Amino acid sequence: MAKTYIFGHKNPDTDAISSAIIMAEFEQLRGNSGAKAYRLGDVSAETQFALDTFNVPAPELLTDDLDGQDVILVDHNEFQQSSDTIASATIKHVIDHHRIANFETAGPLCYRAEPVGCTATILYKMFRERGFEIKPEIAGLMLSAIISDSLLFKSPTCTQQDVKAAEELKDIAKVDIQKYGLDMLKAGASTTDKSVEFLLNMDAKSFTMGDYVTRIAQVNAVDLDEVLNRKEDLEKEMLAVSAQEKYDLFVLVVTDIINSDSKILVVGAEKDKVGEAFNVQLEDDMAFLSGVVSRKKQIVPQITEALTK
């Protein structure tokens, strides 16, 4: 059978990596023996913690040209967040929980998008709908993705469907949600040993917002100052990358995973629009955003609206 490439977005987070593995398992169970999970970037410390806990190898890094190849996208749909050769691929299926933008196909496809907190929640439902067995390691990855995307159920993107799925998955995976969840989030929140370049790319996405291209990077931390003490180096790199990639705005969101707040650092000609988006005044290119933790629900829509007025 022909190969089916399954992968999440560039700079993959735990949901992107886990959902690729889970979807490959789903496809195998329904008879697609050519289904294989891939990744579009390095595995984060948080994701590696989950993979190690449940003894699952990381997917292979995708380097193939996808021209004419069958692909399944998980946890994304926007082409700028996908493989560089996605436009010439044959997209067979999309499983996602984000907005739909900058996406088109030459032929029909299966597309499942739901307003839940995590792609893995949708995949959990798909397994249940088909009556497929959820192995302990698959349950563990589903649970890890839900915990990651919902910041242990604190994010406003989290729904009752996510919570219900997690409650059922913990029994299959045989873990304590609170203990495992906090350990996993903390594993990904240490930043002292990470370079500025790594921090700005570990969880970053590009968005087209009207006439502007905006880059939004997010870093989870236990101590915000641990990251922002390197403000000068961060700004220098953000400006350099913006010039190289032609970003109109670059926003770094540093999120406190304990207190559920964030600070933003913004560079770009339209940076004042970001302040307007949150009704705050940027001071030294920074602002504190109380209760803001979700890029998808609390950051992207607000900045998009400010830039497209």
Swiss-Prot record:
SUPFAM superfamilies: DHH phosphoesterases
EC number: 3.6.1.1
UniProt-listed PANTHER family: BNIP - RELATED, MANGANESE-DEPENDENT INORGANIC PYROPHOSPHATASE-RELATED
Keywords: Cytoplasm, Hydrolase, Manganese, Metal-binding
Species name: Staphylococcus aureus (strain Mu50 / ATCC 700699)
Molecular function GO terms recorded: inorganic diphosphate phosphatase activity; manganese ion binding
Catalyses which reaction(s): diphosphate + H2O = 2 phosphate + H(+)
Main subcellular location of this protein, as a coarse class: cytoplasm
GO CC entries: cytoplasm
Record text on cofactor binding: Binds 2 manganese ions per subunit.
Positions bound to Mn(2+) 2: D15, D75, H97, D149
Signal peptide segment: none
Protein name: Probable manganese-dependent inorganic pyrophosphatase
Pfam families: DHH, DHHA2
UniProt record similarity statement: Belongs to the PPase class C family.
Gene name of the record: ppaC
Subcellular location, record wording: Cytoplasm
Transmembrane segments: none
Cofactor: Mn(2+)
Matches recorded under HAMAP family: PPase_C
Highest rank taxon of the organism: Bacteria
Annotated Mn(2+) 1 binding sites: H9, D13, D75
UniProt entry tagged with the keyword Repeat: no
